[in-house]
UniProtKB/Swiss-Prot annotation:
GO biological process: carbohydrate metabolic process; citrate metabolic process; tricarboxylic acid cycle
Species the sequence originates in: Glossina morsitans morsitans
Enzymatic reactions: oxaloacetate + acetyl-CoA + H2O = citrate + CoA + H(+)
Pathway membership: Carbohydrate metabolism; tricarboxylic acid cycle; isocitrate from oxaloacetate: step 1/2
Name of the molecule in the record: Probable citrate synthase, mitochondrial
CDD domains listed in its UniProt record: ScCit1-2_like
SUPFAM superfamilies linked: Citrate synthase (SSF48256)
Length: 465
């Protein structure tokens, strides 16, 4: 039986009543219920819960905004509602209340596998429930059935020059998929706003199903002279089909892909890609247009290119200090990097203040499957050396490694050497979180986003009062 998880810790009487109401819906949902059925049963009670919460506490002040926050990328401003995940500075990301280690324990794995299936994580993000293995297999089959690309998108992908960046191809193909948007058609036909979520859900399921085919086509066209299978095997899970279409057949790489697609899926709602999807979606752009916009943000070097920068830095380090540098050589190179005005890529995070659990689970995977790999051993040495040096500078709030410090090393080990492609993998994964959030945006009837902006002159006048 599925496990129902409530995402709030508030103990207000009205919330407790609504929780009981929500539980009454859940009691009638069997372990074999479809994802859509489970979600549909939860939405009315959640709508009522949010409605009553806003009615009772709508004027509650969440914090203050400073001038530095406005000029500093809005860091720390509490201004968004995202149900799918919350990032704790000390514990890292929690998906609907579950940490990454907890997800690894309770989410179903493939037969013979150990890592959680992304289908199960999507179920968790969308419903707040841990699904049964049967429910996860149901999602795998449904995504396989929805995966075929329309011919105009296939033609488009095959006509792109191989010199076009993979993320440009990815974004363009996703945009072109909106030709068949069910939400756009329903909106044009005058569907009632209470039904918006249903059509956003359908588009999101279609899009997630098609992304591995789009991404694999880009990979094969750009790096394999078009060679590769684009056929979907309905007996395989989402990740296994993706790996097969990419042209890889190592079961351990498939396990890595399941882990990778799970841990990169969501990271609150304030990062560039997640916020962009929410923002564009708030204008009632369909999921294809909204997600494509988010992918254009992910393509930016400050967001989705970090794991490439880590690998470039590691290769430069090896070139200068050798493939097996001593601790003293590492310290010398790291200080050289810092004194030149650069950062050590893969270290630090805007929110986290401890080692990123996404780094930790990748390290555990490497320790199990590739402990003697030269690049992994170098990353392990750096893990010991960098934090104390960054602490010594006194300028870094978080000296610990983040997810990007490790992911590229694992992909390199299994033969995926094409660094320009890594952000596409990130994008395929990120769809799980941002599209689950987009469904809830429409289910809760969130309005178009329109914050107030001020000029520097006006700010100066305000502080002089």
């Amino acid at each position: 039986m599925s496990i129902y998880r409530i995402s709030t810790t508030r103990k207000m009487p009205e919330v407790q009543k609504l929780n009981a109401l929500l539980a009454s819906y859940v009691r009638f949902i069997s372990a074999d219920s479809s994802l859509r059925d489970v979600l549909a049963a939860k939405i009315p009670a959640e709508q009522e819960r949010v409605k009553n919460f806003r009615k009772q506490h709508g004027s509650f002040k969440m914090g203050e905004t400073t001038v530095d926050m406005m000029y500093g990328g809005m860091r720390g401003i509490k201004a968004l509602v995202t149900e799918t995940s919350v990032l704790d500075a000390d514990e890292g990301i929690r998906f609907r209340g579950l940490s990454i280690p907890e997800c690894q324990k309770v989410l179903p794995a493939a037969d013979g596998g150990e890592e959680p299936l992304p289908e199960g994580l999507f179920w968790l993000l969308l419903t707040g429930e841990v699904p049964s293995k049967a429910q996860v297999k149901q999602v795998s089959r449904e995504w396989a059935a929805r995966a075929a690309l329309p011919q105009h998108v296939v033609t488009m992908l095959n006509n792109f020059p191989t010199s076009l960046h993979p993320m440009s191809q990815f974004s363009a193909a996703i945009t072109a998929l909106n030709h068949d948007s069910k939400f756009a058609k329903a909106y044009s036909d005058g569907v009632h706003k209470s039904k918006y979520w249903e059509h956003v859900y359908e588009d999101s399921m279609d899009l997630i199903a098609k992304l591995p085919v789009v991404a694999a086509t880009i990979y094969c066209n750009t790096y394999r002279n078009g060679k590769g299978s684009k056929s979907i095997d309905s007996s395989l899970d989402w990740s296994a089909n993706f790996v097969k279409m990419l042209g890889y057949d190592d079961p351990k790489f498939t396990e890595l892909m399941r882990l990778y697609l799970t841990i990169h899926s969501d990271h609150e709602g304030g990062n560039v890609s997640a916020h962009t999807v929410h923002l564009v979606g708030s204008a009632l752009s369909d999921p294809y247009l909204s997600f494509a916009a988010g992918m254009n943000g992910l393509a930016g070097p400050l967001h989705g290119l970090a794991n490439q920068e880590v690998l470039v830095w590691l290769r430069k380090l090896q070139k200068e200090a050798g493939s097996n540098p001593s601790e003293e050589q590492l310290k010398e190179y790291i200080w050289k990097t810092l004194k030149s005005g650069q950062v050590v890529p893969g270290y630090g995070h805007a929110v986290l203040r401890k080692t990123d659990p996404r780094y930790t689970c990748q390290r555990e995977f490497a320790l199990k499957h590739l402990p003697n790999d030269e690049l992994f051993q170098l990353v392990s040495k750096i893990y010991k050396v960098v934090p104390p040096i960054l602490q010594e500078t006194g300028k870094v709030k978080n000296p610990w490694p983040n997810v990007d410090a490790h992911s590229g090393v694992l992909l390199q080990y299994y033969g995926m050497k094409e660094m320009n492609y890594y952000t596409v993998l990130f994008g395929v994964s990120r769809a799980l979180g941002v599209l689950a959030s987009l469904v809830w945006d429409r289910a809760l009837g969130l309005p178009i986003e329109r914050p107030k902006s001020l000029s520097t002159d006006l700010l100066m006048k305000m502080v002089q009062k």
